[in-house]
Design a protein with these regions (language model features):
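Phosphate-binding beta-alpha-beta segment of Rossmann-like dinucleotide-binding domains, i.e.
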Residues: 91, 97-145, 157-160, 164
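Short glycine-/small-residue-rich Rossmann-like dinucleotide-binding loops
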Residues: 54, 76, 199, 205-207, ...
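Rossmann-like dinucleotide-binding domain for NAD(H)/NADP(H)
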Residues: 226, 232-315
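Short, conserved active-site loop motifs that form the nucleotide-linked donor/cofactor pocket
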Residues: 26, 91, 186, 284-286
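Beta-strand-loop-alpha-helix segment that lines the small-molecule cofactor/substrate pocket
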Residues: 62, 66-69, 81-93, 203, ...
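An N-terminal-biased, well-structured beta-alpha scaffold segment characteristic
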Residues: 1-94, 196, 216-221
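Residue-level detector of alpha-helix initiation sites
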Residues: 56, 77-80, 99-100, 145, ...
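Rossmann-like dinucleotide/phosphate-binding beta-alpha-beta segment
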Residues: 23-24, 134-225
Length: 315
């Protein structure tokens, strides 16, 4: 790769970004506070663009990148990127799910243990000087059937972290077959069996037109033994209104959400506010602000994952 090729970085990245990319012959223009108008104006000067989830790489932006050779997504999801147009323009797309998969797996285990052991309620009560052991009696993860919906980098990482808990792990992935042939701690099942047996549903699918609000009232109601839901994928794949209905009816024991349909909480509609408040007030829900993959270690590791992939481009 020729030296001094310029790339534009428009979102917050770990401080190692300059050193890591300089090591593969790329100079970073680090502009995390850049406006979209500025981005469009200066993009023609760059061969690469590095983004996170807040930047929409759409037709308007792509067509301005006359010398653009690649887009790097610092993370896993690419729902904010016009993937088809990039391919049509022969612009490479790189993401970095390898960089934060361990973080997501660990976060999921933490959320699941909190649900099973009612730690949100127990913590709240003790802080209020209530000492109620019986009402906070929890369940063991051992022998539970944990269903992983989508077995990519994140789903497989969650399965790896569950190995030591003596639970039964089943997985369903519509677009993969034989993905458990070399591992003995996960059973690959068809959707019918998955819905019949899963007690815990952990969602690990990308947001696409097909998966948008896939998990609605009817879909969730088709599960026969479902007790807990964990979503660390994309908020829009799960209908929170329908989740609220099922949860408040007592048909679920708990839900842990790292992602929401609308994560800009100051823009909620009145209907969304009612739904969110009902879920926030529920004793058996746990929330985190889209941080499952957001650890100090993953923050730096993502730089190295992207750099390694980008270094293989033939300029």
């Amino acid at each position: 790769m020729p030296l001094n090729q310029k790339i534009l970085v428009v979102d917050q990245m770990h401080d190692s970004i300059h050193e890591v990319f300089r090591g593969i012959g790329l100079e970073c223009s680090y502009r995390p506070d850049i406006t979209r108008k500025e981005m469009i104006q200066i993009l023609p000067d760059y061969v690469g663009l590095i983004i996170r989830s807040k930047t929409a790489v759409d037709e308007e932006l792509i067509l301005k990148g006359k010398d653009l050779r690649f887009v790097g997504r610092a993370g896993a999801g690419v729902d904010n990127i016009d993937v088809d147009l990039l391919a049509k323009k022969n612009i490479e797309l790189f993401n970095a799910p390898e960089g934060n998969r361990d973080a997501v797996g660990e976060h999921g285990v933490g959320m699941l243990l909190m649900l099973l052991n009612k730690l949100r309620l127990a913590d709240k009560e003790v802080r209020s000087y209530q000492w109620d052991r019986e009402s906070n009696r929890g369940y063991e993860l051992k022998n539970k059937v944990v269903g992983i919906f989508g077995f990519g980098f994140m789903g497989s990482a969650f399965a790896e972290k569950l190995r030591g808990f003596d639970c039964e792990i089943i997985a369903y992935d519509k677009y993969k077959k034989g993905y458990t042939s070399d591992i003995d701690y996960v059973k690959e099942v068809e959707l019918t069996d998955f819905k019949l047996r899963a007690e815990v549903l952990s969602i690990h699918i990308p947001l696409t037109p097909e998966t948008s609000h896939l998990f609605d009232y009817d879909y969730l109601s088709s599960f026969q033994n479902l007790k807990y839901i964990i979503n660390m994928a994309r908020g829009e794949v799960l209908s929170l209104k329908d989740l609220k209905t099922i949860l408040c009816a007592g048909n679920l024991s708990g839900a842990a959400l790292d992602v929401l349909e609308n994560e800009k909480l100051n823009t909620l509609t009145s209907e969304e506010q009612k739904t969110y408040q009902s879920l926030f007030d529920h004793e058996h829900t746990i929330f985190s602000p889209h941080i499952a993959g957001w650890t100090y270690e993953s923050y730096e590791r993502i730089n190295h994952v992207l750099a390694k992939k980008i270094s293989e481009i033939k300029f």
